């Protein structure tokens, strides 16, 4: 009986310690750093700011899901602060920052950023409020490839040699007899070469890992 009471007492002490530790973590000066690390954020310059002074990047929606795509990528950002937010900026190197167009001077802002050109970069986003405090920089990835692969075919006796290249990776060589129904030959690489026998009049094309399709070539 005494042993059970002792164990119960120890359990109560442990629970109290956990509660106190949780309080310190979420209401002390290290709270923002901890939350930032849990949400993939990087360091802020406001090391001595009081809890709650810093703006917060609440949500970032990346239309690409951080995977390689062959379309425009939209970044939708929501930020808030106890003070009015004066700007939301983006950077590719954490040194050079550019302000995102939007409606500011409110405590909750939503802004949108669209990328259209080919790129493979890490994007950083931060918010600044009227007191000059900055949020932790949110990190996401932009991977766009709209450039179609290139394909060259050559004929040697009954065989056709196909050479395909791409800025990222060629994922398949496709062939068809009617330009409507295509069969895949799986490949992988920035530059690939295959030799195969095709009937005269067969159409060939290359597809890259982003889904871009090359010009069609015909076996003569």
Which role fits each region the language model picked out?
Residues 5-12, 17-220:
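Low-complexity, disordered linker/stalk regions enriched in Pro/Thr/Ser/Gly
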């Amino acid at each position: 009986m005494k042993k059970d009471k002792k164990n119960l007492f120890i359990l109560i002490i442990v629970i109290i310690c956990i509660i106190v530790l949780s309080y310190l973590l979420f209401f002390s000066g290290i709270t923002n750093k901890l939350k930032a690390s849990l949400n993939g954020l990087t360091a802020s310059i406001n090391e001595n700011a009081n809890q709650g002074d810093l703006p917060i990047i609440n949500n970032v929606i990346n239309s690409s899901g951080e995977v390689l795509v062959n379309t425009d990528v939209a970044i939708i950002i929501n930020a808030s602060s106890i003070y009015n937010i004066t700007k939301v900026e983006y950077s590719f190197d954490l040194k050079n920052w550019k302000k995102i167009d939007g409606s500011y001077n409110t405590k909750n802002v939503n802004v949108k950023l669209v990328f259209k050109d080919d790129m493979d970069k890490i994007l950083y986003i931060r918010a600044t409020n009227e007191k000059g405090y900055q949020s932790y920089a949110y990190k996401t990835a932009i991977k766009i490839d709209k450039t179609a692969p290139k394909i060259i075919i050559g004929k040697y006796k009954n065989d056709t040699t196909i050479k395909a290249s791409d800025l990222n990776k060629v994922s398949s060589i496709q062939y068809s007899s009617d330009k409507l129904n295509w069969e895949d030959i799986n490949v992988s690489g920035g530059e690939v070469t295959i030799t195969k026998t095709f009937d005269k009049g067969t159409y060939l094309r290359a597809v890259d890992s982003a889904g871009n399709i090359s010009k069609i070539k015909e076996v003569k």
